[in-house]
């Protein structure tokens, strides 16, 4: 399949959007014919747990809709990275890729504090409010796009291919090469 659909086990609110139990989520994750795991997502059993990783191929490979064969280097044009990350239990870990205009608006309780490196005490932002804001941002990303910049702005761009022929002076990462 070129779009692994996942059925929600329970009602959930992500950001400002409500998803009902039983809703089938379009992930855009590709699963090659005959494969036991999604493309670009190595699965292993370790320390008593199933662990799933992500490799470059999750974004930079796809399954051909007609032949059902893997096309390495082609972008996964419908991979829904924003929705997948918003559904994660701690999308705030990726807040540097969301639209964050500072943290003062998220400070709800001034008794929750941290001591800074210079010995001062500063209030901590509300983690649930930040999670909600990050999720709202990620839900706006169109499928086939990803934000790889760490600039506190939401500026996803289309997932590129990883072919380099004819791309000179740009490499697979998009940066100019000498």
Question: What are the roles of these predicted feature ranges?
Answer:
Residues 1-178:
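Periplasmic c-type cytochrome electron-transfer domains
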